[in-house]
Curated annotation (Swiss-Prot):
Protein name in UniProt: Putative uncharacterized protein VPS61
Species for this entry: Saccharomyces cerevisiae (strain ATCC 204508 / S288c)
Comment field (misc): Partially overlaps RGP1. Disruption phenotypes caused by deletion of this gene may also be a result of a defect in its overlapping gene.
A GO biological process held by the record: protein targeting to vacuole
Domain of life assignment: Eukaryota
Keyword Transmembrane appears in the UniProt entry: yes
Name of encoding gene: VPS61
Record membrane topology: Single-pass membrane protein
Residues in the signal sequence: none
Length: 190
């Protein structure tokens, strides 16, 4: 599953599907199906990430904040002896597109990406501290890639660090800007 997603991401990354709407729809359907199946196939320690995904899909701010606090509390309990765990948080941003409809999406900070990956992989606290202090070596970036307006797409956050741990991260991002615009940058390893 992850191998397929990595391949699909690379195709999207190099804009092969930008002008092929039919193929993009098929690719999106594949991502959606894989993500739904993964939620049932992964061990329990991975479920926190799928709760984070639910924050995006809930319509009310109150529900999103409730799920967010539950996820943050779980991560704090798991890393209760690690001082940086208290800084884990999702940056929930609300934007207003030209047509006035409110859109909400989540941007993960670099430290959050690192700590979440450590939580998923059960890395020891000593190792976690070492990786946090050397964060800049791994070049983890929170990136929004805009392919088409007002559509959802699952993106794999790829970096040298994620490849090192063998972890694939997915985010749902609701786009509201001009298609093809890239914010931030991706570091894709071979």
């Amino acid at each position: 599953m992850y191998r397929f997603c990595a391949h699909a991401y690379l195709l999207l990354k190099y804009e092969k599907y930008h002008n092929q709407n039919q193929q993009l729809k098929k690719l999106w359907a594949s991502f959606r199906c894989l993500f739904r199946l993964a939620a049932f196939a992964l061990p329990r320690r991975y479920q926190s990430f799928f709760e984070a995904e639910l924050i995006l899909k809930n319509s009310t701010l109150e529900t999103r904040l409730t799920l967010y606090r539950r996820l943050r509390s779980r991560l704090r309990l798991k890393n209760k002896n690690y001082t940086r765990s208290s800084s884990i948080m999702f940056n929930i941003q609300t934007t207003f597109p030209p047509h006035g409809e409110m859109k909400t999406f989540i941007v993960l900070r670099e430290v959050d990406l690192l700590l979440l990956s450590l939580e998923f992989m059960n890395v020891s606290l000593a190792r976690a501290d070492l990786l946090v202090r050397n964060l800049h070596y791994f070049a983890i970036h929170s990136t929004l890639v805009m392919l088409h307006q007002y559509e959802y797409i699952y993106l794999m956050l790829t970096s040298g660090f994620c490849r090192y741990l063998g972890v694939c991260f997915f985010m749902i991002i609701q786009k509201y800007v001009t298609p093809g615009v890239m914010l931030g940058r991706w570091k894709v390893t071979a």
